[in-house]
């Protein structure tokens, strides 16, 4: 089956309305992109939990809609414009998209990732690259965290170099469960992963089972306020600052805290947020991101 892709350039305040209208009128999928992407005018657009986004769309947005080969995109675009009260119909571009083996195509884009001296993240369709490797079998797409992002790599490298076998571990904001799983594979004792997203909790349980690892994963309200030898949180700077008191309380006296998801320019303010409970210093940085660590007195 072939598909038809329709691309419409719209104003910032019209992007969401166009997306909804095209969906209502039969589009199989709709995405919104920066119309100036890959040009000097490209506009970074991102937010962070705990902060209201300053802007919800790009100044010039490109709405990309996908239709089946039996649809008439011209009729749909005209109907959407009429529904939105837009006249004349804005210009748009059409192109044919051939059907492919999308699973095979996606798999071809992911290779095993070497994270540390011995740690490898390996998709299920690949074999372990080294016989003595610490292998995490993990497929992309289940939840955030596959080892490809610098913050995940930094945390995994810290665990490889600093984890003491038998230590209890809390992975707060576990995502795919990757840090909890690698901690167990490196010899950690009781390990708990917490995430506010039920899908992440399910993905973590699935990944732990696939990797033959015993670890508990749950939503925050389902876990006791126990303290741990090691607490790891790879989130973002603003949530980390908001949770400073809570995360610090989860670290037992003499235990250690490891934080990432923090840009180099944010490290000082994150460390300041935790200063009432424990000192944090930069352990390592990569591609503008840092890993902070410290020991609770």
From Swiss-Prot:
Catalytic activity: L-lysyl-[protein] + 3 S-adenosyl-L-methionine = N(6),N(6),N(6)-trimethyl-L-lysyl-[protein] + 3 S-adenosyl-L-homocysteine + 3 H(+)
Gene Ontology MF: a single term: protein-lysine N-methyltransferase activity
Domain of life: Bacteria
Keywords, in A-Z order: Cytoplasm, Methyltransferase, S-adenosyl-L-methionine, Transferase
CDD domains noted in UniProt: AdoMet_MTases (cd02440)
A GO biological-process term: methylation
Functional description taken from the UniProt entry: Methylates ribosomal protein L11.
Protein's recorded name: Ribosomal protein L11 methyltransferase
Biological source species: Cupriavidus taiwanensis (strain DSM 17343 / BCRC 17206 / CCUG 44338 / CIP 107171 / LMG 19424 / R1)
């Amino acid at each position: 089956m072939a598909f038809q892709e329709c691309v419409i350039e719209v104003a910032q305040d019209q992007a969401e309305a166009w997306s909804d209208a095209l969906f209502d009128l039969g589009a199989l999928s709709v995405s919104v992109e920066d119309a100036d992407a890959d040009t000097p005018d490209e506009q970074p657009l991102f937010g962070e939990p705990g902060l209201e986004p300053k802007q919800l769309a790009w100044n010039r947005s490109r709405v990309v809609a996908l239709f089946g080969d039996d649809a008439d995109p011209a009729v749909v675009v005209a109907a959407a414009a009429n529904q939105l009260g837009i006249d004349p119909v804005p210009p748009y571009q059409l192109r044919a998209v051939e059907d492919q083996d999308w699973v095979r195509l996606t798999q071809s884009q992911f290779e095993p990732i070497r994270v540390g001296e011995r740690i490898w993240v390996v998709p299920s369709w690949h074999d372990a690259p080294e016989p003595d490797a610490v292998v995490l079998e993990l497929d992309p797409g289940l939840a955030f965290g596959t080892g490809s992002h610098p913050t995940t790599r930094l945390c995994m490298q810290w665990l490889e170099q600093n984890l003491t076998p038998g230590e209890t571990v809390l992975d707060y904001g576990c995502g795919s469960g990757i840090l909890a799983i690698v901690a167990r594979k490196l010899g950690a004792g009781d390990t708990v992963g917490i995430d506010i997203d039920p899908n992440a909790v399910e993905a973590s349980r699935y990944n732990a089972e696939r990797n033959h690892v015993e670890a508990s994963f749950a939503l925050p309200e389902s876990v006791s306020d126990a303290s741990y030898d090691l607490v790891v949180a790879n989130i973002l700077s603003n949530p980390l600052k908001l949770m400073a008191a809570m995360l610090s309380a989860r670290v037992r006296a003499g235990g250690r805290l490891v934080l990432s998801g923090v840009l180099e320019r944010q490290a000082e303010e994150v460390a300041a947020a935790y200063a009432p409970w424990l000192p944090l210093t930069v352990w390592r940085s990569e591609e503008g991101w840092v890993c902070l660590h410290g020991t609770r007195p």
